[in-house]
Amino acid sequence: MSSSRPVALVTGANKGIGFAITRDLCRKFSGDVVLAARDEERGQTAVQKLQAEGLSPRFHQLDIDNPQSIRALRDFLLKEYGGLDVLVNNAGIAFKVNDDTPFHIQAEVTMKTNFFGTRDVCKELLPLIKPQGRVVNVSSMVSLRALKNCRLELQQKFRSETITEEELVGLMNKFVEDTKKGVHAEEGWPNSAYGVTKIGVTVLSRILARKLNEQRRGDKILLNACCPGWVRTDMAGPKATKSPEEGAETPVYLALLPPDAEGPHGQFVQDKKVEPW
């Protein structure tokens, strides 16, 4: 028996920006908030931390690299809630700048999670999004920087209003293949594997927003990519300028856009403002 209670889900939520987004949604969202994390133990510890603050998130395991794990979460949401109101795709990985893992392996591993994992979550969970639902894909300003460092022909493809999901997948796979062959620089790619994966997330968001316009126009679902800023997390390190709480502001703003909001939709948003892509 599914409850009609609204529900919000945050992925990669056991620490950093994801944890801060979950905390803020627990305070502001009128419904249940599901904290999803790959590691059950760390996820439960994060839930206990929030419970100690008087908040009551629910936990569900989610490894976005594992299609079975995504489907288990989908089934849970359908059974318990009959759908999903807010989806925040925050889970992602990055290698440290000084990591000596070969670049092609960094490219493959980062792409698998940041782009393909996020895409798989969208594939399974977007059909569950209820009318006036909100979807937020956490991208990065690094994607904009990486875009500007791509060869012009690649930039034009990534900025195209008509690029298809299949074409985008082809380009993401080509980047990984080019790194394996050691030709990514001469093929016009930038030197940031993380940056290219986040170009993928931003462009995927534009494509999915367009699909929602075509297939579910009357449902007023808003889907955006955003940059939380340079945030002090395990990923970005201690020198970053924003706290995780400050990093959560834009994702939470997009997750809680009022029901009558016309936009933003299909945009790249930073500091609550639409950035030109």
Swiss-Prot record:
Q: Name one GO biological process term.
A: xenobiotic metabolic process
Q: Subunit info? A: Monomer.
Q: What is this protein called?
A: Carbonyl reductase [NADPH] 1
Q: Which reaction does it catalyse?
A: a secondary alcohol + NADP(+) = a ketone + NADPH + H(+); prostaglandin F2alpha + NADP(+) = prostaglandin E2 + NADPH + H(+); prostaglandin E1 + NADP(+) = 15-oxoprostaglandin E1 + NADPH + H(+); menadione + NADPH + H(+) = menadiol + NADP(+)
**Natural source organism:** Mus musculus
Which residues are NADP(+)-binding?
Answer: 10-34, 63-64, 90, 194-198, 231-233
Q: Do you know which InterPro entries this protein is assigned to?
A: CBR1-like, NAD(P)-bd_dom_sf, Sc_DH/Rdtase_CS, SDR_fam
Q: Recall the taxonomic lineage recorded for the source organism.
A: Eukaryota, Metazoa, Chordata, Craniata, Vertebrata
Q: What is its EC number?
A: 1.1.1.184, 1.1.1.196, 1.1.1.197, 1.1.1.71
Keyword Acetylation assigned:
yes
Q: Which residues form the active site?
A: 194
**Major subcellular site:** cytoplasm
GO molecular function (one): 15-hydroxyprostaglandin dehydrogenase (NADP+) activity
Q: Which CDD domains match?
A: carb_red_PTCR-like_SDR_c
The enzyme class is oxidoreductase
Q: Which residues carry this modification: N-acetylserine?
A: 2
Q: Which residues carry this modification: Phosphoserine?
A: 2, 30
Q: Where does substrate bind?
A: 140
Q: Provide the family line.
A: Belongs to the short-chain dehydrogenases/reductases (SDR) family.
Phenotype caused by lack of the gene? Embryonic lethal.
PROSITE patterns given in the database record? ADH_SHORT
Per the record, residues carrying N6-1-carboxyethyl lysine are 239
Give the residues the record marks as binding glutathione.
Answer: 95-97, 106, 193-194
